[in-house]
Swiss-Prot record:
It holds the Pfam family Acetyltransf_1. The gene is Naa30A. It comes from Drosophila melanogaster (Fruit fly). Catalytic subunit of the N-terminal acetyltransferase C (NatC) complex. Catalyzes acetylation of the N-terminal methionine residues of peptides beginning with Met-Leu-Ala and Met-Leu-Gly. This is N-alpha-acetyltransferase 30A. The lineage of its organism: Eukaryota, Metazoa, Ecdysozoa, Arthropoda, Hexapoda. Residues 90-127 have a biased composition (Low complexity). It comes from the Eukaryota. Keywords: Acyltransferase, Cytoplasm, Nucleus, Transferase. Disruption phenotype: Flies are viable but display a 'held out' wing phenotype, characterized by the abnormal positioning of the wings, a typical feature of muscular defects. Flies also show male sterility, reduced longevity and age-dependent loss of motility due to developmental muscle defects. It catalyses: N-terminal L-methionyl-L-leucyl-[protein] + acetyl-CoA = N-terminal N(alpha)-acetyl-L-methionyl-L-leucyl-[protein] + CoA + H(+); N-terminal L-methionyl-L-isoleucyl-[protein] + acetyl-CoA = N-terminal N(alpha)-acetyl-L-methionyl-L-isoleucyl-[protein] + CoA + H(+); N-terminal L-methionyl-L-phenylalanyl-[protein] + acetyl-CoA = N-terminal N(alpha)-acetyl-L-methionyl-L-phenylalanyl-[protein] + CoA + H(+); N-terminal L-methionyl-L-tryptophyl-[protein] + acetyl-CoA = N-terminal N(alpha)-acetyl-L-methionyl-L-tryptophyl-[protein] + CoA + H(+). Its EC number is 2.3.1.256. Residues 1-208 are annotated as: Disordered. It is found in: Cytoplasm; Nucleus. Residues 192-201 have a biased composition (Basic and acidic residues).
């Protein structure tokens, strides 16, 4: 019974102390001999005022039980009000540590300084450095508030989210401006370097390529003049094989050796050759006989090597053959050529030949031919 009365008396006395503490929050606990609350392991600070006298063991046991009950529930003292939004966002207020979230209701600057750890110091240094870089020289640091400006409980006037909201807005702008300026410098630098690279290699290549080009221009090309070509008549049998190889290489229509012999043996004076450096580069084979009471000359074959064209070799050979036919009283000259052979058509038409007749599928390859004719009388 005595224990129950003592416990009730202690509980009543504790409630009175608690009510007086709530009414006078600025009351200094050191002046009344009360002991400051200990920081529990769950990260919340509880300030419980105990009496200086230790002779009342039941009261102490009751306070211990109440303290355990508060710890088990996960809540601190009623003095621990809800955190402001800025404190929750930033994780610290009034110099409190970011990791421990310690609140000091006593308002003592010494106690607040004792709750700082290395993390809060580092964060304050980083905030100062960022504000200096951002150009906010007049902004105050949220972790370095004056003692007289620090209230007992966290309020909206001294929360840490006020200063960051005013200082963090210009900081990204400044960083963006700096980044833009740096990007411009980098871009201009890369542009200059690229322009130099674009300008420099072509000059190097040009310098390296100039000697080659000049060397190629200085090389004497094997230019052959028309005066170097030698024209002669057919002379002997040993020229037969050279004529055959030349014509077979240039003409599409195959001829047997008997065809060559027919023309060359019967009209050797109407066969002319063009040579250069003792090599035959052109040949013409013709005939002249009676056709319907008319002496008709006929150009059977004309060939010039490709590398010796554009030297008027073909024109010269045809002219020599026509002159020989005229000397033998020829009345006309005829020939056939492919319709798609435009160089041959131009050659003969320039000499006075006209298109007389179209011969369908005249050649073995199925190509049509055009008959050209030149009249003397």
């Amino acid at each position: 019974m005595a224990d129950a009365q003592a416990a009730a008396a202690g509980k009543k006395k504790y409630k009175n102390k608690k009510n007086s503490a709530e009414k006078n929050p600025n009351h200094n606990p050191n002046s009344s001999g009360q002991v400051e609350a200990q920081t529990p392991s769950n990260g919340h600070v509880q300030h419980q005022e105990e009496e200086a006298t230790e002779d009342q063991e039941p009261a102490q046991e009751l306070r211990g039980l109440l303290k355990k009950m508060h710890l088990c529930n996960g809540h601190g003292h009623k003095e621990q009000e809800a955190r402001p939004l800025g404190e929750v966002v930033n994780g610290h207020a009034h110099g409190h540590s970011n990791n421990n979230h310690i609140r000091c209701t006593s308002g003592s600057s010494n106690n607040n300084n004792s709750t700082h750890n290395n993390n809060s110091v580092d964060s304050s240094n980083n905030n100062r450095k960022q504000r200096r870089e951002g150009g906010d020289g007049g902004g105050s640091d949220s972790n370095s508030l004056k003692p007289e400006e620090k209230p007992i409980t966290a309020t909206s006037k001294t929360t840490a989210n006020i200063h960051p909201t005013t200082t963090t807005d210009p900081k990204p702008k400044v960083s963006e401006d700096v980044a833009v300026e740096q990007g411009v410098h980098v871009a201009t630098g890369s542009g200059h370097s690229r322009e130099q690279e674009r300008k420099q290699p072509p000059s190097d290549y040009a310098e390296g390529a100039t000697p080659t080009i000049t060397a190629q221009l200085q090389l004497p090309e094997p230019a052959i003049s028309a005066d170097e070509i030698v024209y002669k008549e057919y002379e002997a049998e040993h020229q037969m094989h050279d004529i055959m190889r030349l014509i077979q290489a240039e003409l599409s229509e195959p001829y047997s050796i008997y065809t060559y012999r027919y023309f060359i043996y019967n009209w050797p004076k109407l066969c002319f050759l063009a040579s250069h450096d003792n090599q035959y580069v052109g040949a013409i084979v013709c005939k002249l006989d009676m056709h319907m009471n008319v002496r008709r000359g006929y150009i059977a074959m004309l060939a010039v090597r490709k590398e010796y064209r554009k030297l008027k070799i073909g024109t010269t050979l045809v002219t020599k053959a026509i002159e020989a036919m005229l000397a033998d009283n020829a009345d006309e000259v005829v020939l056939e050529t492919e319709m798609r052979n435009q160089p041959a058509l131009r050659l003969y038409e320039n000499l006075g030949f006209v298109r007389d007749k179209r011969l369908f599928r005249y050649y073995l390859n199925g190509v049509d031919a055009l008959r050209l004719k030149l009249w003397f009388r």
